[in-house]
Amino acid sequence: MEKVMQLKTIKEYNDYMGVETRHPLVSVIEGSRMPHPVPHARKHVGMYVIFLKELRCTDDLTYGRRSYDFQENTLLFIAPGQVFGHEADGSTFTGSGWCLLFHPDLLRGTPLGRHMQDYTFFSYAANEALHLSKQEQQTIIDCLTKI
């Protein structure tokens, strides 16, 4: 049985990716600015993760026990307590695209926090990514650069 990496905090996730933690509850990672290749691993996360994939990936990314359906210019959503990633086979990946991380504590006590379970794109059942137009992709990038 493969070991699953436990990443409970934003700092732990950022340390794994080799990037600086600027806030304990939220992080934006621009893949092209990652300082070094990162080893593949299956990860159990304690935060919400939203990936903007700009390139088509040929490796299988699993979310739970299923493969994620994604091409280029897609958003992928991972909920706290879920497992995702690639098999830890000794290979590495280099950054591309963007990643937004936010801890559930950021939303605790807010109207949005009380309704996060209503957003089904964060569930295992929703293993199909949200495909974006170039204009939608640019809007997302503009927002991420402001966080």
Regions picked out by a protein language model, each given a short descriptive name:
Residues 44, 77, 101:
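Short aromatic/basic micro-patch
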Residues 33, 81, 146-147:
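Generic short beta-strand segments
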Residues 1-62, 66-69, 128:
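Generic protein-terminus/edge-of-domain signal
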Residues 65-79:
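Short acidic-glycine-tyrosine-enriched beta hairpin
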Residues 58, 76, 80-89, 107-108:
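Histidine-centered metal-chelating micro-motifs
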